[in-house]
A protein has these predicted regions:
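Compositionally biased, charged N-terminal/linker segments
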Residues: 1-66, 159-162
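Structured loops at beta-to-helix junctions and adjacent beta-edge loops in soluble globular domains
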Residues: 28-30, 110, 144
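Short, acidic Gly/Pro/Ser/Thr-rich loop/turn segments
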Residues: 32-34, 114, 151
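Short, charged, solvent-exposed linker or helix-capping segments at domain edges/interfaces
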Residues: 38, 116-122, 153-155
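Short, charged beta-turn/beta-strand-edge "cap" motif at the junction between a beta-strand
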Residues: 73-79
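Aromatic- and Lys/Arg-enriched surface recognition patch
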Residues: 82-142
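Charged phosphate-binding loop/patch that engages nucleotide di/tri-phosphates or the phosphate backbone
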Residues: 146-163
C-alpha cells in the first residue's frame, strides 16, 4: 500500500478580508506547551493551531473564516483568558497528523487582555452561565456568542468594538 503524502507546509497567514460579521471562538492551550507569550512571539505570521484531536473542535475550526476573533485561554495552569487572536489561515491539514484526518487553522496574536479573565470570574458571571467554557470546559476549540464576547472583553478591560 503506498504511503500517504506528507501534509503540506502550513500556509502563511493572509491579510484578513474582514468577514461582514466575524464569529468568535475560544482557543485553549496549556501554557507549559504553548503560551500566550509564545503566540505573541510568532508575530503577524501567526501559528498553526495543531494537535487538536476532537471531532467537535475540528468542526469548529472548519467553520472558521479569515478575520474571526478568538480568546487565547491558558488551561491547567492559570485557567484564564489572557489574549485575543485572529484567524489568519483557514482550515488545512494538521502537519502533526500523519493520518490526514485532522485539520487546523492558523491564528495570530492581536492584543493582550489588560486584565486576564479567570475561569472563576467567568463562572461567577450570570451573563456567561451558558458559555461553552462553563458547560463543556474540556473542549479545546469552542464557539463564543457575540454577547459572551462583549462581556468577557468588558471584564478584561477591552472595548469589544476596538478589537
Amino acid at each position: 500500500m503506498p504511503r500517504k503524502p506528507k501534509a503540506a507546509a502550513t500556509p502563511a497567514c493572509k491579510p484578513a478580508a474582514p468577514a461582514s460579521t466575524p464569529a468568535f471562538w475560544l482557543f485553549k492551550s496549556e501554557p507549559d506547551s504553548f503560551s500566550w507569550e509564545q503566540q505573541k512571539a510568532r508575530g503577524k505570521k501567526g501559528e498553526a493551531w495543531e494537535g487538536v484531536r476532537n471531532f467537535l473542535a475540528r468542526s469548529n475550526m472548519k467553520a472558521m473564516r479569515l478575520g474571526d476573533r478568538g480568546f487565547f485561554y491558558h488551561s491547567n495552569v492559570g485557567k484564564e483568558i489572557v489574549g485575543i487572536v485572529e484567524v489568519c489561515a483557514l482550515a488545512h491539514p494538521d502537519a502533526s497528523d500523519a493520518t490526514g484526518v485532522w485539520k487546523c487553522v492558523d491564528v495570530r496574536a492581536l492584543a493582550d487582555m489588560p486584565k486576564p479573565v479567570s475561569l472563576v470570574a467567568v463562572k461567577a458571571n450570570r451573563k456567561l452561565a451558558n458559555m461553552v467554557l462553563v458547560r463543556s470546559s474540556r473542549l479545546s476549540v469552542q464557539p463564543v456568542t457575540p454577547a459572551e464576547w462583549a462581556e468577557v472583553c468588558r471584564m478584561g478591560g477591552l472595548d469589544p468594538a476596538s478589537i
